[in-house]
């Protein structure tokens, strides 16, 4: 059986250059293949509740003691296919419980005690603006999907994600990078601390960040080298900043 380079781009099976000096190696001759995925918080209200998207800069030592707290355990259950997710089963065996600190911008939806509301209209508008800036194709219907999250950072046990558009591209000095998809999803709760007691491990989260909208952008593996990856990241970041409606640290 013979081995051929992918796409015929590699001249030989051995790297050309000094392997002790990675900077001297040609990424394309090595068969370098790269795509990137980025997440950007939006400066809006929460995605599926009408709560404020304000973030509180508290630590486990400074968070107000009078903020309500709820303690939960996540239980692995069967999905639509009638099977229990392997990661969920593993997490259940860790015997961890979770304490959620209810910030002023957290309500019944953040506590998973009420059904989610429709998408925040401002978050959708910003997403569609970015879609237009990259020449993407919006989907005809927005349908929230559920991604299993078993580390306790989502009170419901899953993250709501909505596909907004596919296709499109971004221009860089080293060439065009195709965009695979853009989704709109919820950020997770913020972890404050992990403690141990006689009953096992207790993880403490605050709910201020849970539900804040995130734009997720994924590219195709068109990036040619590390410098090209930097250019692509910068181009995507500039597009998002040009909306004037994203959060910046």
Stretch-by-stretch model annotation:
Residues 2-249:
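Basic, nucleic-acid-interacting segments
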């Amino acid at each position: 059986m013979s081995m051929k380079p992918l796409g015929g781009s590699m001249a030989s099976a051995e790297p050309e250059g000094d392997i002790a000096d990675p900077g001297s190696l040609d990424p394309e001759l090595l068969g370098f293949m790269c795509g990137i995925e980025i997440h950007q918080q939006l400066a809006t209200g929460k995605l599926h509740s009408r709560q404020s998207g304000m973030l509180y800069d508290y630590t486990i030592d400074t968070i107000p003691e009078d903020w309500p707290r709820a303690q939960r355990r996540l239980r692995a259950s069967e999905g639509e296919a009638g099977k229990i997710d392997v990661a969920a089963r593993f997490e259940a065996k860790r015997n961890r419980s979770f304490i959620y600190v209810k910030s002023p911008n957290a309500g019944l939806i953040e506590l998973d005690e009420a059904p989610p509301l429709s998408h925040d209209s401002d978050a959708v508008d910003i997403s569609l603006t970015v879609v237009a800036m990259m020449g993407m194709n919006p989907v005809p219907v927005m349908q929230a999907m559920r991604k299993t999250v078993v580390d306790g950072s989502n009170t419901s046990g899953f993250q709501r994600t909505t596909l907004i558009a596919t296709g499109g591209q971004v221009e860089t000095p080293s060439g065009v990078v195709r965009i695979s998809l853009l989704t709109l999803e919820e950020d997770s709760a913020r972890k404050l601390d992990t403690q141990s007691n006689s009953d096992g491990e207790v993880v403490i989260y605050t709910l201020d960040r849970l539900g804040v909208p995130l734009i997720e952008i994924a590219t195709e593996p068109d990036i040619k080298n590390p410098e090209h990856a930097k250019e692509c990241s910068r181009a995507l970041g500039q597009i998002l900043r040009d909306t004037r409606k994203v959060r910046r640290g």
